[in-house]
């Protein structure tokens, strides 16, 4: 999405102290979901060093999310490209700097037909052994997929006939769940299903979602290029 000549300095929430004095553009997130422990003062300090600031993330464990801290974060951003429509409705209502992006990882998953009639159960181990492309091929072989992880379920929606899921609880508090599965399903199908309930996949809805996300991502790329051009053309402060 960034111009080919862009020089990128990667930071994680554990390496914020290594931030440089200033940046033309700070991009917060890679399409992932943030939650309460990440809303720290060091994060806001790094954002202050950017001439332009963009967020590409969703939210999770919303019951634990301190609203004032999240509002403060959104206020600092020139644009927030939200992972879910729920994010926009809950935190972006009335704001001019919030747009729905979708989960751009779906563009990595082609629409295919399964070749195995059996049932695949996916847990945390799914990312341990195979390269990403092989993992995708493995998941897409099965016509019936049960997942406790979000992105394997998203992958399965492009191939499986039936899927089911279990939400991700917060630490040892099973009553508090991430909410990501529900938000993703509503974005794609306009509704959600209870945990551990098999449901048929509407492939046409998945295709429409893929197309929408691709258009949104293309528009995001154009916005980032325009931001960098404007920063380069701006007179020194």
Write out the residue ranges for each language-model feature.
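Active-site anion-handling motifs in enzyme catalytic cores
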Residues: 1-237
